[in-house]
Amino acid sequence: MPTVISASVAPRTGAEPRSPGPIAQAAQGKGTEAGGGNPSGIYSAIISRNFPIIGVKEKTFEQLHRKCLEKKVLFVDPEFPPDETSLFYSQKFPIQFIWKRPPEICENPRFIIGGANRTDICQGDLGDCWFLAAIACLTLNERLLFRVIPHDQSFTENYAGIFHFQFWRYGDWVDVVIDDCLPTYNNQLVFTKSNHRNEFWSALLEKAYAKLHGSYEALKAGNTTEGMEDFTGELTEFFEIKDAPRDMYKIMKKAIERGSLMGCSIDDGTNMTYGTSPSGLKMGELIERMVRNMDNSRLRDSDLIPEGCSDDRPTRTIVPVQYETRMACGLVKGHAYSVTGLEEALYKGEKVKLVRLRNPWGQVEWNGSWSDSWKDWSYVDKDEKARLQHQVTEDGEFWMSYDDFIYHFTKLEICNLTADALESDKLQTWTVSVNEGRWVRGCSAGGCRNFPDTFWTNPQYRLKLLEEDDDPDDSEVICSFLVALMQKNRRKDRKLGANLFTIGFAIYEVPKEMHGNKQHLQKDFFLYNASKARSRTYINMREVSERFRLPPSEYVIVPSTYEPHQEGEFILRVFSEKRNLSEEVENTISVDRPVKKKKPKPIIFGSDRANSNKELGVDQESEEGKDNTSPDKQAKSPQLKPGNIDQESKEQRQFRNIFRQIAGDDMEICADELKNVLNRVVNKHKDLKTQGFTLESCRSMIALMDTDGSGRLNLQEFHHLWKKIKTWQKIFKHYDTDQSGTINSYEMRNAVNDAGFHLNNQLYDIITMRYADKYMNIDFDSFICCFVRLEGMFRAFNAFDKDGDGIIKLNVLEWLQLTMYA
């Protein structure tokens, strides 16, 4: 049974994974989301339909920059304005920050001084050390750095108060445009700053990342893996150091040589993620500490620039709010560090493995062996000492022995890069497949396998491992692959009360007889089959990743939250050393068509809606015995069937009599009359929970069943509808297992399939959102309305799909006729 914890666990170890392919070029578009223009992906048709309501396509950085230069104005970002709405969302800050542009803060402001490096990052009064540790790692790889931080920006040439940065966002690269207004207090930057007072790239990068997530407060607390992946688009592996392999130092050394990014931390005993406050520390307490800290800083010395003092003097760093726990050795629990180097040095004739780390605070350091104040430096060769100390010239960076490192630190993160990013042709590349998905409450949010009644409803992805690894030292026929499940937008939605879900996944082998059919595996399969592999546990992190080795075969991956009924979006990435194929199951949309014994005569209709319903002109269940009645008379005929009336059953005669009583002499019924006849019959079924069919539902039924465009139903049309309702009623009762008069929305998938409709996961999700109530139940009238609409829409599509290729072309009149009369 799965267990749930609130901290990460180590993945299975082995050779480090590699992400695939060349680096993608950053897309320029909407500042805070993936690209501009019309959206794509999940529910793309629905979102595209409403996209003009949300806003027009965003202008690119170049367009905005050029416009500001032409008008000779400084850019002000309307999406992330320089006011309190961009700072905190949980409560108002008691101190008034002043937003200033760099030229207003100091003389001679510079974007980058002497190249961006790890010493340019000093943490301010915000708990985002995890993000700053990732920046420090990023500065070690110039190629990656230049992609995230375009270097053609300055405060002199073509300065317009506008800057841009590029981040990976769930499969896409996005260009985030900001103005250069920064929050200050006593003329000092409140948040991240550089070691040089007049250098601003790190502060502006932090602002762009805050915009990406909606506010500065949204950056409080996180994992270095998040920042690493958003800077690279690559995959991060997570190690619990106490469970690390014996060759961990070798793994770290190899990662440094490859240019991989690494971060580490020490558990604070509260099961909180890096940079978070201890349990119980609210945002209000954090703000109070920030206020006290800034006031104390103001009293210590003046922030005014002394006359004749250059603005490029070192920044006096305000030590950030220390809700992390500082240890006697100088290390800080619950705090993120960057691993910036590894070396070996001779000490008393023996080789000692060393690790170089950096604290984003820029001040608080390790004070044990190999620290700046270490008393045994005299036992180290002078040249060796000079070489090591030359590499840690700034505050916040220090050496410690590898033994001390694994003794004190508890977690290590390694962000593995592509061969292109690593600038090496010899490194092994991995192939990748990416799938987007969504958990929808009441349909596809089934929870983990502790909940067998709903686990099977989760999204399922088929994985075909086609080729074994090339490993001459391994005789097993094995495929190595890595699965990474990432939940989307939870940090940005914090202000709406969203927190990270506890997520994980399981992998099952598909029986050979089911290979290639792409069917959604049912409840019984998971009840009687054990998983072949799974994430070690369920974790409340943005991404869960795990390395596996399985024989070539076909598998199904089931990603889920720990608890059922939790809604959210995710991406599922699969990396493998050899060729693999990963895709969502049930991606074919179709409807079972009745086998017709004779081809019906062509009928001419007066509208496109009627044309889309043309197959109802002939009874689908019994087409033999047709007479030579003309189409027009046939449509108006009061006869239930073209055959002999004497063959009618007692039920059919009763049906005809009821219909005649309601319809009158013209033998056609309108929506009001349809409502009366349906409710009159349904009310006799006390086992169906329904408040009766509404007038609007009946109007929709008429529109979807009307074969002649009259706006009414004749006997034949009504009989077809009634037979369908009776068939669907049996399906409804079959899935009403508790005889409550409703069915659980999770059962709607099977009910739809039993009715002959085959949909994909997105359509099942949409049906649940459209027809289920807040208790995830569907009553009888909603159930019938859903099936009538499916029947009508499939019939309409097939009527216009002349060549059967699954694509139709409509003009605006046809489109409006089909959608307005439905």
Swiss-Prot record:
<dbReference type="GO" id="GO:0045893">
    <property type="term" value="P:positive regulation of DNA-templated transcription"/>
</dbReference>
<dbReference type="Pfam" id="PF00648">
    <property type="entry name" value="Peptidase_C2"/>
</dbReference>
<comment type="subunit">
    <text>Homodimer; via EF-hand domain 4. Interacts with TTN/titin. Interacts with CMYA5; this interaction, which results in CMYA5 proteolysis, may protect CAPN3 from autolysis. Interacts with SIMC1. Interacts with UTP25; the interaction is required for CAPN3 translocation to the nucleolus.</text>
</comment>
<dbReference type="GO" id="GO:0008307">
    <property type="term" value="F:structural constituent of muscle"/>
</dbReference>
<keyword id="KW-0106">Calcium</keyword>
<feature type="domain" description="EF-hand 4">
    <location>
        <begin position="788"/>
        <end position="822"/>
    </location>
</feature>
<feature type="region of interest" description="Domain IV">
    <location>
        <begin position="650"/>
        <end position="822"/>
    </location>
</feature>
<dbReference type="InterPro" id="IPR054069">
    <property type="entry name" value="CAPN3/13-like_C_EFh"/>
</dbReference>
<feature type="domain" description="Calpain catalytic">
    <location>
        <begin position="74"/>
        <end position="418"/>
    </location>
</feature>
<dbReference type="GO" id="GO:0005737">
    <property type="term" value="C:cytoplasm"/>
</dbReference>
<dbReference type="GO" id="GO:0060090">
    <property type="term" value="F:molecular adaptor activity"/>
</dbReference>
<dbReference type="InterPro" id="IPR001300">
    <property type="entry name" value="Peptidase_C2_calpain_cat"/>
</dbReference>
<feature type="domain" description="EF-hand 2">
    <location>
        <begin position="693"/>
        <end position="726"/>
    </location>
</feature>
<feature type="active site">
    <location>
        <position position="335"/>
    </location>
</feature>
<feature type="binding site">
    <location>
        <position position="717"/>
    </location>
    <ligand>
        <name>Ca(2+) 2</name>
    </ligand>
</feature>
<feature type="binding site">
    <location>
        <position position="803"/>
    </location>
    <ligand>
        <name>Ca(2+) 4</name>
    </ligand>
</feature>
<feature type="binding site">
    <location>
        <position position="673"/>
    </location>
    <ligand>
        <name>Ca(2+) 1</name>
    </ligand>
</feature>
<keyword id="KW-0963">Cytoplasm</keyword>
<feature type="binding site">
    <location>
        <position position="738"/>
    </location>
    <ligand>
        <name>Ca(2+) 3</name>
    </ligand>
</feature>
<dbReference type="GO" id="GO:0071277">
    <property type="term" value="P:cellular response to calcium ion"/>
</dbReference>
<protein>
    <recommendedName>
        <fullName>Calpain-3</fullName>
        <ecNumber>3.4.22.54</ecNumber>
    </recommendedName>
</protein>
<feature type="region of interest" description="Linker">
    <location>
        <begin position="588"/>
        <end position="649"/>
    </location>
</feature>
<dbReference type="InterPro" id="IPR018247">
    <property type="entry name" value="EF_Hand_1_Ca_BS"/>
</dbReference>
<dbReference type="GO" id="GO:0005509">
    <property type="term" value="F:calcium ion binding"/>
</dbReference>
<feature type="region of interest" description="Disordered">
    <location>
        <begin position="1"/>
        <end position="36"/>
    </location>
</feature>
<dbReference type="InterPro" id="IPR022684">
    <property type="entry name" value="Calpain_cysteine_protease"/>
</dbReference>
<dbReference type="GO" id="GO:1990092">
    <property type="term" value="P:calcium-dependent self proteolysis"/>
</dbReference>
<dbReference type="InterPro" id="IPR038765">
    <property type="entry name" value="Papain-like_cys_pep_sf"/>
</dbReference>
<dbReference type="Pfam" id="PF01067">
    <property type="entry name" value="Calpain_III"/>
</dbReference>
<dbReference type="GO" id="GO:0097264">
    <property type="term" value="P:self proteolysis"/>
</dbReference>
<dbReference type="GO" id="GO:0043066">
    <property type="term" value="P:negative regulation of apoptotic process"/>
</dbReference>
<dbReference type="GO" id="GO:0051281">
    <property type="term" value="P:positive regulation of release of sequestered calcium ion into cytosol"/>
</dbReference>
<feature type="binding site">
    <location>
        <position position="708"/>
    </location>
    <ligand>
        <name>Ca(2+) 2</name>
    </ligand>
</feature>
<dbReference type="InterPro" id="IPR033883">
    <property type="entry name" value="C2_III"/>
</dbReference>
<dbReference type="GO" id="GO:0030239">
    <property type="term" value="P:myofibril assembly"/>
</dbReference>
<feature type="binding site">
    <location>
        <position position="747"/>
    </location>
    <ligand>
        <name>Ca(2+) 3</name>
    </ligand>
</feature>
<feature type="binding site">
    <location>
        <position position="710"/>
    </location>
    <ligand>
        <name>Ca(2+) 2</name>
    </ligand>
</feature>
<keyword id="KW-0677">Repeat</keyword>
<dbReference type="GO" id="GO:0006508">
    <property type="term" value="P:proteolysis"/>
</dbReference>
<dbReference type="GO" id="GO:0031432">
    <property type="term" value="F:titin binding"/>
</dbReference>
<dbReference type="Pfam" id="PF13833">
    <property type="entry name" value="EF-hand_8"/>
</dbReference>
<dbReference type="InterPro" id="IPR000169">
    <property type="entry name" value="Pept_cys_AS"/>
</dbReference>
